[in-house]
Amino acid sequence: MRLVFMGTPDFSVPVLEALVAAGHEIACVYSQPPRPAGRGKKDRPSPVQARAEALGLPVRHPVSLRSDEALADFAGLQAEVAVVVAYGLILPQAILDAPTRGCLNIHASLLPRWRGAAPIHRAIMAGDAQTGVCIMQMEAGLDTGPVLAREAVDIGPEETTAQLHDRLSALGAALIVDTLARLDQLEAVPQPEDGVTYAAKIDKAEAQVDWDQPAEDVDRLIRGLSPFPGAWTLLGDTRVKLLGSRIAEASGVPGTVRLNPLRVVCGTGAVELTQVQRAGKAVQSAADFLNGSAIEDGTLFKGKS
């Protein structure tokens, strides 16, 4: 099938690779423009652009798709389907209408739950037992289109956003290949009006831990914001990111550190920290963090006040 692929971050790369491996003709890859990155602030191509170029595929990275030139360029590709996954630009109606069989979006949630920008983070932060991937026929609304295929997965009790991200990326890659192979047999099912929730973009202000909250909420925050932006607390004046956790038991006032293993008391219950990162340092296991720190039992982490 003649496709246009539209994606930008790491999440999208396995999908592009799967479409190529399945023998689809990729007429063009669209991705966000290169951004300044690294210490030298040199322009760096997106993960999708870098992989597409390595595969020998043509790449376009327009700043907008609304100009007459951009619309004509897209229509000229004469694609049957556009596959869209975490592209980052809103597609105008003329783009949605250009492929003869429409635009298909890979969305990392079980729609209509968690429409929007951060469905993986929000599913973990909300304590959802399950999430998954949907293949949706795109329309003008935000993740409102009818669903062609869906597959659910359980969220592990210690799973982080990074881990779930990789699982859902692989699942989405397999599901879109299967969907395209069976496109003539699949029925697009409208999303129900009940159960709609929105996965708002993560605000860094959410990331500071409030140790007065129940351990379940703190654990979900830590896992849901790992690795980015990373839940954090203060040890003295030093910011410490908390990147892995599990539910534990300990007593004391909220924020109290207990050792062997590294645990922190919450409003109710406690969390055990499994991965941490001091400001300017590499990610460490809790054991390595304790070996390199002068933390004593009873030390207080300062949380959100």
Curated annotation (Swiss-Prot):
Keyword Protein biosynthesis: yes
Database matches in InterPro entries: Fmt (IPR005794), Formyl_trans_C (IPR005793), Formyl_transf_N (IPR002376), Formyl_transf_N_sf (IPR036477), Formyl_transferase-like_C_sf (IPR011034), GART_AS (IPR001555), Met-tRNA-FMT_C (IPR044135), Met-tRNA-FMT_N (IPR041711)
Residues binding (6S)-5,6,7,8-tetrahydrofolate: 109-112
EC number: 2.1.2.9
CDD domains recorded: FMT_core_Met-tRNA-FMT_N, Met_tRNA_FMT_C
Recorded family membership: Belongs to the Fmt family.
Protein name: Methionyl-tRNA formyltransferase
Record organism: Roseobacter denitrificans (strain ATCC 33942 / OCh 114)
